[in-house]
């Protein structure tokens, strides 16, 4: 069985993606249904959703939305790599909430859009 570990879904009617305005070629919806049709055709059996750098206020909604899709009959969604902002003051509480959710398999902080000081600082070492 093939496992796709890096699926991005975009639903602009449900979540905000500020960065899409600067990338016209990607500024459209990418649905699970379209993905599933193609993935099954080539033998993908399971998939992990990789966060899509939604607006910070939508981070938990993105995880919940993908988890909801995973409950559909025949869904290949096995988990989510959730977005995170370790530099935010409420990160510890966010992390505890997400760690309680078995659907969350890991975390990613998009770094190419923030100053290097963030990834080189203590917050990423601690």
Which sequence ranges carry the predicted segments?
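An N-terminally biased module of ancient metal coordination in phosphate/nucleic-acid-related enzymes
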Residues: 1-67
């Amino acid at each position: 069985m093939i496992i796709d570990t890096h699926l991005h879904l975009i639903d602009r009617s449900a979540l905000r993606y500020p960065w899409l305005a600067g990338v016209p070629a990607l500024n459209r919806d990418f649905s699970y249904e379209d993905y599933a049709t193609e993935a099954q055709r080539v033998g993908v059996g399971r998939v992990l959703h990789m966060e899509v750098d939604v607006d910070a206020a939508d981070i938990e909604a993105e995880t919940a939305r993908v988890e909801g899709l995973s409950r559909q009959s025949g869904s290949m969604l096995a988990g989510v790599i959730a977005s995170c902002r370790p530099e935010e003051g409420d990160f510890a509480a966010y992390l505890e909430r997400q760690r309680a959710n078995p659907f969350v398999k890991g975390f990613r902080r998009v770094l190419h859009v923030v100053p290097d000081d963030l990834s080189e600082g203590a917050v990423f070492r601690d």
